[in-house]
């Protein structure tokens, strides 16, 4: 797998040709295959992240905290620990000095806006969805974000969406309805509230994706992911938790057993962001997003293993239909000028 995450790049020889690639025509295919592999891996990490967070929310101090406070405190702790993992990775790969420089740029500010939308807003809705509807159901609905991204791109970026793309959007929404229409067995009295809050995450991540793709024209993906996570935790700690009285819960969590559970979830979350941004960089967002959305399928697997979930045929069918719709959305998207510019940046003409 090409090590874009580790920061290695083909070394050009005296003629300017990428000497690390002996067959020039193989470079794009090799990079794209690596990007698709990273996208699959990122989905697995994110599925594990959501299920492990669901376990943590059922532990002290979150289980005893107010319904509004617990998911927000868990989100702040998760993003803070994930930021620590990602900063350590940047330091290990020699990128630490790029963080403040990127943050001070215009594209860095765009990333901050994406972080607020995808972090405190979307992530909080996602965690409330897990708390009230269960991890597998919340993840199934939030997996429709590629379709949301397609709609937003059409409206705000004026990107064309083909008939196949619109069909995919309809199929994706239908899959989410199939997966979430009937409450699961068990004590989940606020199931539909959880579904509505998971929908907030879906919209928020769609908006975040559009903003982040624009910002990554000038900011390296690994650095962009780290700035996104760091901005999110700052907003949680400075703004959100003080407003809801959640700082004592966060402080209590730092000395509890649940800290280690969230630490594991944060490691998976950090790995997911690193691999997902690498996938976008190598394969392009239109190819990486649907494979990443397989996290809903991974969530079922991890829920069965870690929580003893017995998935219903309806849930499994809904997830599969959702993923099929996501594939239709991105396979029906025409190549835009941004896609071609991204290819030029990743695969210079001299290396082709």
What is each of the regions a protein language model found here?
Residues 53, 149-153, 208, 212, ...:
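Hydrophobic/aromatic and small-residue hotspots that mark the transmembrane alpha-helices
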């Amino acid at each position: 797998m090409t090590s874009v995450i580790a920061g290695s790049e083909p070394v050009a020889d005296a003629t300017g040709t990428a000497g690390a690639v002996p067959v020039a025509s193989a470079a794009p295919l090799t990079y794209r295959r690596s990007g698709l592999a990273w996208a699959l891996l990122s989905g697995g990490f994110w599925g594990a992240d959501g299920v492990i967070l669901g376990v943590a929310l059922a532990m002290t101090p979150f289980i005893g905290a107010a319904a509004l406070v617990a998911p927000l405190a868990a989100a702040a702790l998760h993003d803070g620990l994930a930021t620590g993992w990602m900063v350590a990775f940047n330091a290990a790969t020699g990128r630490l000095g790029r963080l403040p420089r990127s943050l001070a740029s215009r594209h860095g500010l765009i990333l901050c806006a994406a972080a607020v939308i995808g972090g405190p807003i979307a992530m909080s809705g996602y965690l409330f969805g897990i708390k009230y509807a269960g991890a597998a159901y919340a993840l199934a609905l939030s997996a429709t974000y590629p379709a949301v991204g397609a709609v937003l791109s059409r409206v705000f970026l004026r990107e064309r969406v083909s008939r196949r793309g619109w069909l995919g959007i309809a199929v994706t929404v239908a899959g989410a309805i199939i997966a979430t229409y009937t409450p699961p067995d068990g004590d989940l009295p606020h199931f539909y509230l959880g579904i509505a809050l998971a929908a907030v995450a879906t919209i928020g991540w769609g908006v975040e994706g559009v903003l982040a793709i624009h910002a990554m024209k000038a900011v390296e993906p690994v650095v962009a992911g780290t700035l996104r996570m760091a901005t999110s935790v700052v907003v949680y700690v400075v703004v959100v938790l003080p407003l809801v009285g959640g700082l004592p819960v966060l402080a209590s969590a730092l000395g509890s057993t649940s800290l280690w559970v969230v630490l594991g979830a944060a490691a998976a979350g950090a790995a997911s962001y690193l691999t997902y941004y690498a996938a976008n960089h190598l394969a392009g967002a239109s190819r990486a997003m649907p494979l990443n959305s397989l996290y809903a399928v991974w969530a079922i697997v991890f829920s069965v293993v870690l929580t003893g979930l017995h998935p219903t045929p309806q849930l499994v069918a809904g997830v599969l239909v959702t993923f099929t719709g996501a594939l239709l959305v991105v396979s029906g998207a025409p190549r835009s000028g941004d896609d071609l510019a991204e290819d030029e940046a990743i695969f210079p003409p001299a290396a082709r």
